[in-house]
Design a protein with these regions (language model features):
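Outer membrane beta-barrel strand-and-loop segments of large Gram-negative receptors
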Residues: 9, 122, 126, 146-208
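Transmembrane beta-barrel strands of outer-membrane/channel proteins
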Residues: 21, 37-43, 89-95, 137, ...
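Surface-exposed extracellular loop regions of Gram-negative outer-membrane beta-barrel proteins
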Residues: 85-132, 153-178
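Transmembrane beta-barrel outer-membrane domains
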Residues: 12-18, 66-72, 116-118, 126-130, ...
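Outer-membrane beta-barrel channels and translocator barrels
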Residues: 30-32, 82-86, 130, 142-144, ...
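Hydrophobic, lipid-facing positions within transmembrane beta-strands of outer-membrane proteins
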Residues: 17-23, 73-79, 121, 131-135, ...
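Gram-negative outer-membrane beta-barrel proteins
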Residues: 11, 31, 43-51, 67, ...
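Signature of Gram-negative outer-membrane beta-barrel scaffolds
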Residues: 1-84, 110
Length: 209
């Protein structure tokens, strides 16, 4: 029954339309610094209909149709400095987004009377936006090889988690467990990356074949 229940609730209708435009600008400073900048605009329009399920009555009903729309401007900048033929430095800044899953957005209600639990969707979810900074330095060996070091930092806004509340009242009824996806807040990630590549064919030429 639980499998059938999940299939009924997850059976929804959704339509997403994304209209986008992009502009790009390239410029070379002197002979060793290159700039590439861009701006992407995305307009997202959503329309969806979910289902409500109550295991006490074993009935499923359609919810009303919900609509939502939003606009995002996503800039990107990349700078490359050719210090010399063997040494390169790169820096970049980008904004990216991740849209909520349809199953989290649809206004569905799933009531489990046996365990006194309720799960509902959240049509007010916002997309997750990531602000990304990257800096790297690459050194190329003349004898075919590369050593690279990099630093990255990401600031993430409105990431999505399942909010779980206990003994929560919803529409006049108290439930032991209430679950709903929500935009939780912000997160910060950073890290270092190192890599080393080298052609070791000079040790054992037979390894090339």
């Amino acid at each position: 029954k639980e499998q059938v229940q999940a299939e009924l609730v997850e059976n929804f209708e959704a339509r997403e339309t994304v209209s986008s435009g992009y502009v790009r600008f390239d410029h070379k400073f002197a002979s060793d610094i290159n700039l590439m900048a861009g701006l992407r605009m995305e307009h997202t329009s959503l329309r969806y209909t979910g289902r409500n399920y109550d295991d006490e009555t074993d009935k499923t009903t359609k919810t009303g149709r919900m609509t939502n729309s939003y606009v995002n401007f996503l800039p990107s900048i990349l700078v490359k400095w050719d210090v010399n033929d063997d040494f390169k430095i790169r820096g970049s800044y980008t904004q990216t987004l991740s849209r909520p899953k349809y199953s989290a957005l649809v206004p569905s209600v799933n009531i489990n009377r046996g365990d006194n639990e309720i799960k509902i969707g959240n049509s007010d979810l916002k997309p997750t936006i990531s602000y990304n900074f990257d800096l790297s330095a690459d050194y190329y060996f003349k004898s075919v090889g590369l050593v690279s070091a990099g630093f990255f930092y990401k600031k993430i806004d409105d990431f999505i988690v399942d909010q779980v509340l206990t003994n929560y009242e919803y529409q006049g009824t108290e439930y032991t467990r209430f679950t709903q996806p929500k935009n939780a807040g912000n997160a910060n990630l950073w890290g270092l990356e190192f890599s080393y590549q080298r052609d070791f064919g000079f040790i054992a030429p037979a390894l090339k074949y």
